[in-house]
Amino acid sequence: MTTPVPPVVAYEPSLGRDARQGSWAELSRGTFRTAIEKVHAAEWEAAARLVEVSVLEAEELRDVYDRWPTATLQWVRDHGATEVAVEEAVRRLGDLIGEPAMAGIAAEWPEYIAAAAAAARLCRDQDPAAAESIEAARRVWQGIHDRAVDRVAGMIDIAVRLVGESALGALWDHLMGDWYDVHERRYALTNQPWEQSAHQLMVAIVDGFHAHLAGTGRQGDIELIEEPHRTGFRFAPCGSGGRSLDPAITDGQPRSGAPFGFAVTTQPHDWAWNTVGICSYCVHCCQLNEVMPIDRLGHPTRVIDPPTWGPEATTTSCTWWVYHDPADVPDSVYRRVGRDPALRPSPSRETAHG
């Protein structure tokens, strides 16, 4: 009797859809890379399922990268910018990032759907060209993703230019209000045990950064770090904010440098870890994972060591930590976002890492 092979894709309740399955070490490897490995192992259906799940991993990005640019420009107008100034700023951005990026992710999304479907079909046909087709789909998605990130980051830069750096935290609060409410309801200690929340947060990390195509090879690879009281996920760099700072994956043109000049913080702010040189796009990670959950739940849900831009030294890697007990989060994490460590919940040792 043969031992059943564990599925590589199955329904994930916390995401409400299918997602990758496996050990954390397996999940730290990019989805496209893993699909190609399955082709080489003649696990054709597994390869096809992985290609198909890459579309689901990318879907949330398709949604927000479609919505955020328009919402940002409206917010800029609502905060006093003239239409002439907005139009001039948008025209400048278009000159920098090009018409395909300015047209938006929705216009390009069908191309990726078609590429992924073609790759999955070749896998099921057991075609020797399947591996090449999977890589072709990855390249299609990388181009679409990166152009969409340029558009979002460029719109955020417009907000900084026309409304001011000090308003950046409020802008991200506006853009992510729906996420905040879901985050608060789900991860409250009164809603479910932290062990369950920690697992869900980790699932969301690997799922999301596969889609961001983290890493210099842009495969979505993540470095897994296991420590006694926390688990870390390092992106070197992530494919969104970290890419804005990294010359190695932007053909020598990081978006925070010339000619783009996308904004980084020039003053300390609670919503940017009170650190100068934080990419304006990366601010949303501080708000969503640290500032907002501390304010609403009493503890961060994920603790981030962010990338930073500097004239002499730039750090492009980013590490997200999930603590096995939120009571173990250090005082310094609270203080660097201007919060009181007294908000921290009491230790709950029964919520051991699962």
Region locations from a protein language model:
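N-terminal accessory segment detector
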Residues: 2-283, 288, 294-317, 324-354
